[in-house]
Amino acid sequence: MILNFIPHQTNSNNIKQNSMAQVNAYLTFNGNCEEAFNFYKSVFGGEFPYIGRFGDMPPSEDGKQVPDEDKNKIMHVSLPISQETVLMGSDTAGEWASHHVVGNNISISINTDSKEEADRLFNGLSEGGTVTMPLAETFWGAYFGMWTDKFGINWMVNYDDPAKMQH
């Protein structure tokens, strides 16, 4: 059976169907994210709507600073490659992201339409798995969390509150 996904509707079998804003691939690199994304840009075309570096981050709550050797590494970059898909990525940096292994460097990134949807997906999909970054408000303004599910798949969920994103 093929279901048409219509926001907050039910099909003839009374199965609730949900909509999601966007599902994208998130690629993690060991220091060469900028080089890789410039290559992808040369093939796909387009522009980077955002490039953030680890040096742009504020100090952590315990006062730790980003080491000088990591400050120019990419914290987040995005490259729209179609109307539906954005390729996103970052470098690993510091002890909190030292587990880069080819094979575990791809995550499924979900951008939700509401904070409640982010909570529901995070809580449901992380059950039995390992939370690597608890779902919380971030310094860049998003409600964001990361985990590895019980099947070993890496996930991210992000909600951008439109009221916070307008400057």
Q: Which residue ranges define each predicted feature?
A:
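Glyoxalase I/VOC metalloenzyme domain signal
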Residues: 2-133, 146-167
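Short, small/polar residue-rich loop motifs at catalytic or cofactor-binding pockets
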Residues: 73, 139-142
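Acidic interhelical loop/turn segments
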Residues: 134-138
